[in-house]
């Protein structure tokens, strides 16, 4: 299913999330199962299915990584079940530095400062990747779509690192 069509957007990485939320509420009202309480079982089932599609579409388009994956899937590149690893050596070196920094937090004299520095480093790198991703997804060239897939892989990895940093921070606060 093309969620951009469902929510009446042109397929693009940059979308207005306020408009997305508004259209989500409109679609929810239109397909909500309560509206079909007195209809046939088939109509009720269809309403439940449509509600699930609307919910999934909203969650997909709301999240930048999932939105990028969806755009790529519409172009024939499915990242949902892949095991391809990032081969960019610069990124792999940066990844190793971040991993070492995560390990060093536990032994730091000022762990909160180390945590804040890592959050800042993640934010800067993520902004750079997101900019490149936007440019690549707006291109119609096949090679740019493949490059965009690499940016998505990197962003997914960074999301995991961010979650790990949050867990470390939470553990230090306990």
From Swiss-Prot:
Pfam families: HSCB_C (PF07743). Keywords: Chaperone. GO terms for cellular component: iron-sulfur cluster transfer complex. Residues 2-74 form the J domain. The keyword NAD does not apply. One of its GO terms (molecular function) is ATPase activator activity. GO terms for biological process: [2Fe-2S] cluster assembly; protein complex oligomerization; protein folding. Interacts with HscA and stimulates its ATPase activity. Co-chaperone involved in the maturation of iron-sulfur cluster-containing proteins. Seems to help targeting proteins to be folded toward HscA. Belongs to the HscB family. This is Co-chaperone protein HscB homolog. It comes from Shewanella putrefaciens (strain CN-32 / ATCC BAA-453). The lineage of its organism: Bacteria, Pseudomonadati, Pseudomonadota, Gammaproteobacteria, Alteromonadales. The gene is hscB.
